[in-house]
Amino acid sequence: MVSQETIKHVKDLIAENEIFVASKTYCPYCHAALNTLFEKLKVPRSKVLVLQLNDMKEGADIQAALYEINGQRTVPNIYINGKHIGGNDDLQELRETGELEELLEPILAN
């Protein structure tokens, strides 16, 4: 079971960053999501907090905290302006409908 302190820490990270992505270095869906953000949509890396959970001592706890917060067990686990987007499939669906660009507009305007 994940501690309330870890849950609060993860919630703070989500709130403090315009875009938050929990990822794993070996995950092809994570690579696709990050490629969409950085390469296709040209989101500056300074606007995105990417946590590579498999490279972090507390990675499993962070992933467990995200599950407690939003019910998603898998990575990538993406937030934009504090709103839970979901995973790569959700990100790509939002891109296809044009909603992703709308969500990113205030971030890219700064």
Curated annotation (Swiss-Prot):
Binding site for glutathione: 24-29, 63, 75, 88-89
Positions carrying S-glutathionyl cysteine: 27
Keywords, comma-separated and alphabetical: Cytoplasm, Disulfide bond, Electron transport, Glutathionylation, Isopeptide bond, Nucleus, Oxidoreductase, Redox-active center, Transferase, Transport, Ubl conjugation
Record-listed cross-link Glycyl lysine isopeptide (Lys-Gly) (interchain with G-Cter in ubiquitin), residues: 11
Enzyme Commission identifier(s): 1.11.1.9, 2.5.1.18
Transmembrane segments: none
Reaction catalyzed: 2 glutathione + H2O2 = glutathione disulfide + 2 H2O; 1-chloro-2,4-dinitrobenzene + glutathione = 2,4-dinitrophenyl-S-glutathione + chloride + H(+); RX + glutathione = an S-substituted glutathione + a halide anion + H(+)
Protein name: Glutaredoxin-1
Organism: Saccharomyces cerevisiae (strain ATCC 204508 / S288c)
